[in-house]
């Protein structure tokens, strides 16, 4: 059998993702501490348990979360959702996260196991119903409650909490499974009142990424004072434009959760939906969530490319997003990207079967499709389809150059409206099959 030289070269391209995407320092919000340990759930002895806690007691913290829409919701998802509803998104002081076991499809015993862990943390904090449980790992296995409980004791009794960079980096490491690098993002922003506020986020995920909220976990904390209803609205808006706009393999997990806590440690006027600063905060959180979500795609299992799919001039944002998602989830598009094949027919096919809310968003005689180079090289744009007509004389050499980039963009102009949406995806390689074929062994 003759081997494909181009694919061999592609597979051999080595990128040190840890060096590229893991920060060396950061800024962190007031009033939060994190602690992590190796409880023994992971067979390799790596960190597998982390706790985020709020130490600001001057006001009740606001909390919000967006959960998986998978019908088989994991026990920690069910429990966390109920707690947030019962407490109207206020007074959440901790999140306990274990990796290595998803506590999913475990029935009532899984619910009880999750409740045991949060009760343990609450007892350490001297509170009641103020902790949310989160889990990630293998589906269908019961939680190792004894090991994790001992890990909780170790974190609290040995005061393994900290608010420095290393503590946060270890926290990010503790929630990893098949991730090749921990995902940590920090940012500081100002509002017109002159005060500065801080956002810190961690995430895990490399496979099973096709959220409507996969296995994907994300946590954002801030010292901004904000009403819980406003926080929920902002997080939903941000998630719909970030974590719900990423795809690695098209699988949706049972455990997906994006959670945000705002403790108001910077004591300024509380923000609500009517505040002048509301839209600015929404934009800040959305941009921040996009940075964090993109790291998940950059760590896509076995991936060699990070691809932005931008759909412009649609009748609605929703239809632009549906088309971007359809392209991003197409295995034929993903494999063509890996093979550096400028197969625009696969892109058009994915656009054509997208289940649009408004069929008028797509007019096949107006559509334009291009590859966009992101490295500054010229020509930046390689047109594949113009006003619905395929460009039969494509510069194959230029196409190969663009498709050889680690970062590139697929641009789609529908020409039917003014709305736009973006999705972030990656290619699918031989290594993806190897990683997931060997996952439980």
UniProtKB/Swiss-Prot annotation:
Keywords attached to this Swiss-Prot or TrEMBL record, sorted alphabetically, are: Acyltransferase, Amino-acid biosynthesis, Arginine biosynthesis, Autocatalytic cleavage, Mitochondrion, Multifunctional enzyme, Transferase
What Pfam families does the record tag this protein with? Answer: ArgJ
Q: Listed GO molecular functions? A: glutamate N-acetyltransferase activity; L-glutamate N-acetyltransferase activity
**How would you describe the post-translational modification of this protein?**
The alpha and beta chains are autoproteolytically processed from a single precursor protein within the mitochondrion.
Task: Give residue numbers for the site Involved in the stabilization of negative charge on the oxyanion by the formation of the oxyanion hole.
Answer: 136-137
In this chain, substrate is annotated as bound at: 177, 204, 215, 301, 436, 441
Give the pathway listed in the UniProt entry for this protein: Amino-acid biosynthesis; L-arginine biosynthesis; L-ornithine and N-acetyl-L-glutamate from L-glutamate and N(2)-acetyl-L-ornithine (cyclic): step 1/1; Amino-acid biosynthesis; L-arginine biosynthesis; N(2)-acetyl-L-ornithine from L-glutamate: step 1/4
The protein here is known as Arginine biosynthesis bifunctional protein ArgJ, mitochondrial
């Amino acid at each position: 059998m003759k081997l494909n030289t181009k694919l061999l070269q592609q597979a051999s391209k080595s990128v040190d993702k840890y060096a590229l995407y893991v920060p060396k320092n950061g800024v962190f919000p007031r009033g939060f501490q994190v602690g992590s340990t190796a409880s023994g759930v992971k067979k390799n002895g790596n960190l597998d348990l982390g706790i985020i806690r709020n130490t600001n007691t001057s006001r009740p913290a606001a909390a919000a979360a967006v959960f998986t829409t998978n019908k088989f919701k994991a026990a920690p998802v069910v429990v966390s959702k109920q707690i947030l509803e019962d407490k109207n998104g206020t007074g959440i002081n901790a999140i306990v996260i274990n990796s290595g076991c998803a506590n999913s499809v475990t029935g009532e015993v899984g619910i009880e196991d999750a409740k045991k862990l949060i009760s343990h943390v609450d007892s350490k904090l001297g509170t009641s119903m103020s902790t949310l449980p989160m889990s990630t790992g293998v589906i269908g296995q019961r939680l190792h409650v004894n090991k994790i409980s001992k890990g909780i004791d170790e974190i609290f009794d040995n005061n393994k909490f900290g608010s420095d960079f290393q503590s946060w980096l270890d926290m990010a490491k503790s929630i990893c499974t098949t991730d090749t690098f921990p995902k940590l993002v920090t940012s500081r922003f100002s509002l017109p009142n002159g005060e500065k506020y801080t956002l810190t986020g961690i995430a895990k995920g490399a496979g099973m990424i096709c959220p409507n909220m996969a296995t994907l976990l994300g946590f954002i904390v801030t010292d901004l004072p904000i009403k819980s209803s406003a926080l929920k609205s902002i997080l939903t808006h941000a998630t719909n434009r970030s974590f719900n706009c990423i795809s690695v393999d098209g699988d949706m997990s049972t455990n997906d959760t994006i959670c945000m806590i705002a403790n108001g440690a910077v004591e300024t006027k509380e923000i609500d939906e009517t505040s002048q600063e509301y839209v600015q905060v929404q934009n800040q959180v959305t941009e921040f969530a996009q940075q964090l979500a993109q790291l998940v795609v950059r760590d896509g299992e076995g991936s060699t490319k990070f691809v932005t799919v931008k759909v412009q001039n649609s009748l609605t944002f929703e239809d632009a997003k549906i088309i971007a998602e359809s392209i991003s989830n197409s295995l034929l598009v993903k494999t063509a990207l890996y093979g550096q094949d400028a197969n625009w027919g696969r892109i058009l096919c994915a656009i054509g079967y997208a289940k649009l809310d408004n069929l008028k968003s797509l007019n096949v005689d107006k559509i334009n499709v291009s590859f966009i180079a992101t490295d500054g090289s010229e020509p930046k744009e390689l047109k594949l389809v113009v006003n619905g007509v395929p460009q039969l004389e494509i510069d194959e050499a230029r196409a190969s150059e663009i498709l050889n980039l680690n970062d590139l963009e697929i641009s789609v102009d529908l020409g039917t409206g003014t709305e736009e949406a973006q999705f972030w995806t990656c290619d699918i390689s031989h290594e993806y099959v190897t990683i997931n074929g060997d996952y439980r062994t």
